[in-house]
Amino acid sequence: MASTPRTPAPVRSPPPVPTPTHPTPPPPPLETPQPPLPVSTPPPALETPPPRRVRTPPPPLETPPPPSPSSSQPGDEYHTPAPSLADGSPREEEASFPSDGREGGGAPAPPKSPQLSPMRLAAPRLLLPPPSPRTPTGQNGQEEQEGGAKAAAAGAGTGTGTAAPARQQLRLTGLARSPSSQRSLATTNSSPSPSPSPTPPSPLTPAAAPVVNNNSNNKNNRSGQSTPKRAAETKLPLSSPAATATIAVQHFNPVEEAVTSPLHLGIGKAQRLDHHQHQHQQRQEQHAAAAAVENGGSVPPDVAAAVAVGERRELSVTLRLATAVLSLAAFSVIASARTSGWAGDYYAHHLQYRYAVAVNVIVCAYSIAQSFGEIRRLISPRFIFRSMSSYYCSLFLDQALAYLLMSASSAAASRNDLWVSRFGTDAFNRKITSALWLSFIAFLMLALNALISTANLFSML
């Protein structure tokens, strides 16, 4: 089949694109990095030499002005007078406000302070003594007048002129000298060191006036250190005995002394201390204390127990010595029992006899040891007190050995009775019988010792 040729399509222009009415903003430009600013380096500074110091001469010293004719003397007092209105210059109203520099004129000069000049006042030691209240008469008056004239001349010589009025001097007008103090003063002048009184003064008695030693005053006056003021103070008028008695009566109150007396316990008679009754009570207490000591009432329990044990110690020593002797005799007789021949016998052939000998030996040794201990406590007082363990040990051994001795003696007696019933009596049996009697008596002594040990133990508990 034949193919038909294809014709190409005509070329057409593309349709027009509509344009927008509003303009489009241009794209933002790209930010370019700013180049770094060049850093300027300062030029190196030139070293300048330090300035030289120029030494200036010190200012001349100001010479003090020459002293004025009315210069002060050493020891004078200076007082600054208060400024007066007449000496100072009147203050202006605008001088009190500081200047702010707006006005043409400069700041006004500050007002000058008044001229200060030292004032010399009379020293207290140069003041004349105040006039004495009493009229100077006799020798004392003449001395006071001479002292006043000397003080006035001294004041005129120093140039004080008219002295200021003196202060009122304090005087002691309540001092008085009693006749007793005058007598003690005379004794003091006659003897340099009087002996002190053996009895202390009563607290209700007013104290004596202080004694003035005239000798010391005379020495002070002679040394030149006394002044008219001191002389006027030391020369006090002596009071009469009546005035001294009046002062003493004012301080003494019999009612107050009776109330505050240590011997007075109350106002009523029932509350007053009776000396004889107090002595009688003391005697009764002493008799009661002595009776209590005799009866053991005031003795400590341990001491009373030790005394009770000591009272039984002699009996215990006697019984223990007897037990030791009887036990020694018993085992000695049993050990010596021996017969020879075809019918001979010996204690070692029988167990019961050996048992009796061993127990008697132990009891004898124990009794001898206990006897020595009790004798030592009787002789030496420092071994009186014993420990509680020793009391327990003594009681236990006494009872145990008494039981063993009774057991051994009974066993030996049974064996001896059986031998006699079979073979009759001979020398061996008779020795065994006598030894057993000694062993039984030793048992009785040891039993009594056990009772004493029990009493001692319960006394110490």
UniProtKB/Swiss-Prot annotation:
The lineage of its organism: Eukaryota, Viridiplantae, Streptophyta, Embryophyta, Tracheophyta. The chain crosses the membrane at residues 315-335, 355-375, 393-413, 432-452. Residues 1-239 are annotated as: Disordered. This is CASP-like protein 4U1. Residues 7-69, 193-204 have a biased composition (Pro residues). Signal peptide: none annotated. It comes from the Eukaryota. The keyword Calcium does not apply. PANTHER family: CASP-LIKE PROTEIN 4A4 (PTHR33573), CASP-LIKE PROTEIN 4U1 (PTHR33573:SF35). It is a multi-pass membrane protein. Residues 116-126, 135-155, 205-221 have a biased composition (Low complexity). Residues 336-354, 414-431 are extracellular. It holds the Pfam family CASP_dom. Keywords: Cell membrane, Membrane, Transmembrane, Transmembrane helix. GO terms for cellular component: plasma membrane. Homodimer and heterodimers. Residues 1-314, 376-392, 453-461 are cytoplasmic. Its main location: membrane. It is found in: Cell membrane. Belongs to the Casparian strip membrane proteins (CASP) family.
